[in-house]
Amino acid sequence: DNIASAKSIIEEIDFDLYVYKVGAFGSPETVTKVIQSFGDNGFPAFAKPNESNKTLTTVLVGPFVSKDDIRTNQTVLNKIAGITMGEIITWNP
């Protein structure tokens, strides 16, 4: 079997991907609602534990192939999240 697993392909990616951090939330219900709002608007979003405050969960939108892709959609992303500014982060699965 010469078909590589998806994990091995992802591990071999040699270019950067980017995500847009829209916030960190303490309520699991809020995290679910925010992720659903992005999904309803055609943007993939996911959650991960907040690194500096273990009681919070960070919501990230993406991944995007470039920072410019995020900047192009930033006004819409901010509106969906109800924020004025998020953070563009280099993402490595």
Predicted region positions:
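Extracytoplasmic
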Residues: 2-16, 26-93
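Conserved beta3-strand ATP-binding lysine motif
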Residues: 23
